[in-house]
Design a protein with these regions (language model features):
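Active-site region of glycoside hydrolase catalytic domains
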Residues: 1-260
């Protein structure tokens, strides 16, 4: 439930979502499906300072958000530094599930929006993390715009986990307070966001990453979970009263780039 803080429930959910992936992939393979992948929400972790306690906090963030899922799928094990804290909350005999979780896949999708900067917060329960606001420009969601993090993640995942396996950027985008004026929407910050992240992806390809696709989030303004219709990610504006669609300037720039 929203707002619930239960480490036992969290540990089991983190395992069971991976086990569900393994069961689903097994079932699809048995039906002859040959193009199976999984999408992970990854965050490049940064320490708030060079203090050892903050560096360790960064490692905890990375372990929970990134390595827990990557290690399970590609190595058949959970990162020991995180498992050491979560082991007592895990399902009985969870180790028996790891071979299924780590069955081979045909591609990996990565959702990337921003980096995470954390400091150690010893007054909080484990993982004792305090989010720190970055210095770069922010989206309407309050997320720092950090395209370098996408390149770094692609390089790291390719080097440490996937090798030549195809990668896809399955989500990347920003929310803006878009308004229609004179039958158009001018969104230069989104244009900058899109092309800076495309440049980061291109740089990763140039360094050997087998990146096969890039999907912007999203084509249309839509319902954004707890934020409802307030946060607009689309490159096409939607009037939610009339359902009228208005392509934004970013839509036109994207189309031009695809045709050039």
């Amino acid at each position: 439930a929203p707002g619930l803080r239960d480490i036992r429930a969290a540990a089991r959910a983190m395992h069971h979502i991976l086990f569900a992936h393994g069961l689903s992939a097994e079932a699809m393979r048995s039906l002859g499906t040959s193009n199976i992948g999984v999408v992970l929400n990854l965050t490049e972790a940064h320490p708030a300072s060079n203090r050892p306690c903050d560096v360790k906090a960064k490692d905890r963030l990375d372990g929970i958000h990134n390595r827990w899922f990557l290690d399970a799928i590609f190595k058949g094990e959970y990162p020991q530094d995180i498992l050491k804290k979560l082991n007592e909350f895990m399902p009985e005999n969870f180790e028996d599930d790891m071979s299924l979780i780590s069955e081979s896949i045909d591609w990996l999708g990565i959702n990337y929006y921003t980096r995470g900067i954390v400091a150690d917060d010893p007054g909080e329960p484990w993982p004792s993390l305090k989010d720190i606001e970055g210095s770069m420009d922010k989206t309407q969601m309050g997320w720092e715009i950090y395209p370098e993090g996408l390149k770094n993640l692609l390089l790291r995942v390719s080097k440490n986990y996937t090798g030549s396996l195809p990668l896809l950027v399955t989500e990347n985008g920003m929310a803006c307070a878009d308004e229609v004026q004179n039958e158009t929407v001018y969104d230069p910050s989104r244009i900058d966001y899109i092309f800076s992240h495309l440049a980061a992806a291109r740089a990763a390809i140039d360094e050997g990453v087998n990146l096969q696709g890039f999907f912007y989030w999203s084509l249309l303004d839509n319902f954004e979970w707890a934020f409802g219709y307030e946060k607009r990610f689309g490159i096409v504006h939607v009037d939610f009263e009339t359902q009228k669609r208005t392509p934004k300037a970013s839509f036109n720039e994207w189309a031009l780039s695809l045709n050039s």
